[in-house]
Amino acid sequence: MTEAAQESNQPAFNIEKVYVRDLSLEIPHAPNIFLERESPQIDVQLSTQTEPIEKDVYEVMITNTVTAKVGEKVMFLIEVKQAGIFQIRNMPPADLEPTLAVMCSNILFPYLREVVSDVAVRAGFAPILLNPVNFERLYQTRQSKLQTESTATTH
């Protein structure tokens, strides 16, 4: 086998594009909410999604919703869909799914974190600093849950 043929069979990973796919900010009780002195309760929801775009090209997206409440009043709600397009060639099928779910999500998360913090500050609130996320553990938990569900449906 020639050297060029060997190189063409090597796994390849490229980040084609990182972008904000969707961004939403709601401040339902403005301007009065800015007079609140109580610290809000922050709820953070996060999910990931992967879609093939074409052969060897995938979109990975992290959806994050941050809701800040004082009592029952919503101070603000930020929803961000941070996405990336990744080209992945010659990867064994067993490695592709974890690469998309874990590695690509780890690449996107710092961008998501920056957008959430920036939007909160520009809206007149303190920055929201999202804690690091263990995407590998999330992936393993999801896989275990899927295996448990498939085992339960076959019995």
Feature annotation, model-predicted:
Residues 1-107, 111-155:
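N-terminal intrinsically disordered, cationic/polar leader segments
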